[in-house]
Amino acid sequence: MKVSSAEFVTSGTRPAHYPPPELPEVAFAGRSNVGKSSLINVLVNRKGLVRTSSTPGRTQLINFFRVNGSLMLVDLPGYGFAKVPLAVKKEWGPMVETYLSTRPNLSCVVLIVDIRREPTEEDQLMLQWLRAYNVAVLVVVTKCDKVSKNERAKQAAIITRTLGLARDEMAFFSALSKEGRDEVWARIEVMLAAGQEEAEESGE
């Protein structure tokens, strides 16, 4: 996808705060500090559109970004960081679950995992939950520049086995080299087209 414009729209914690559900939305989910913000920034060619932080758990709101005036990218709060206060964790779960289960214009979810780490139980539960709700999912494996080719192949096998993935449900990505940018966009566009076709067939 050629990105001509990308802009921050709003942040929120509940549906009343979200933009009107007029544009298709692609949500980005994953553990804290897995490279979500960097992935979005590279996809839209805007280095500072989404703030990156070395402090896991920093993103505590659902953030909306409009791309080309025709698509919304949605940055969901990261999960699984032990030092985040329990009270905040309790708010995050319902907030994210409500968004994912009730947002009518959600087209697909990009689930992000770090190639240097085995998928956690939370990653597995998130994927199972999305599948149960029939949400289209692409798993993006980030930080691929941090490992050798042999290690990448080894970790890819672990990730596909642990998450029960087919190879075409996964894409490799590096924010440093921008490897995988075009493939991730291509996969997203396929899921968007499928979602549009499904919506037309159902008369929505």
From Swiss-Prot:
Family matches, as Gene3D superfamilies: P-loop containing nucleotide triphosphate hydrolases
Key words of the record: Cell cycle, Cell division, GTP-binding, Magnesium, Metal-binding, Nucleotide-binding, Septation
Residues the entry annotates as binding GTP: 30-37, 57-61, 75-78, 142-145, 173-175
Molecular function GO labels: GTP binding; metal ion binding
GO BP annotation list: division septum assembly
Alphabetized InterPro entries for the sequence: G_ENGB_dom (IPR030393), GTP-bd (IPR006073), GTP-bd_ribosome_bio_YsxC (IPR019987), P-loop_NTPase (IPR027417), Small_GTP-bd (IPR005225)
Protein family per UniProt: Belongs to the TRAFAC class TrmE-Era-EngA-EngB-Septin-like GTPase superfamily. EngB GTPase family.
Protein name (record): Probable GTP-binding protein EngB
Organism of provenance: Geobacter metallireducens (strain ATCC 53774 / DSM 7210 / GS-15)
